[in-house]
Amino acid sequence: AYVSQSGAPWGLGRISHK
């Protein structure tokens, strides 16, 4: 898991499990 940046469809500023 990691903190994704703004503009990412699989995150949008939140933590994703990709």
UniProtKB/Swiss-Prot annotation:
Optimum pH is 8.0. Disulfide bonds: none annotated. Its EC number is 3.4.21.-. Optimum temperature is 55 degrees Celsius. Strongly inhibited by antipain, PMSF and aprotinin. Inhibited by benzamidine by 49%. The keyword Hydrolase applies. The keyword Hydrolase applies. GO terms for biological process: proteolysis. Keywords: Hydrolase, Protease, Prothrombin activator, Serine protease. GO terms for molecular function: peptidase activator activity; serine-type peptidase activity. Belongs to the peptidase S8 family. Homodimer or multimer. Subtilisin-like serine protease. Cleaves prothrombin at 151-Ala-|-Met-152, 271-Arg-|-Thr-272 and 316-Tyr-|-Ile-317 to produce meizothrombin(desF1)-like molecules. Degrades fibrinogen. Inhibits plasma coagulation. This is Subtilisin-like serine protease AS-E2.
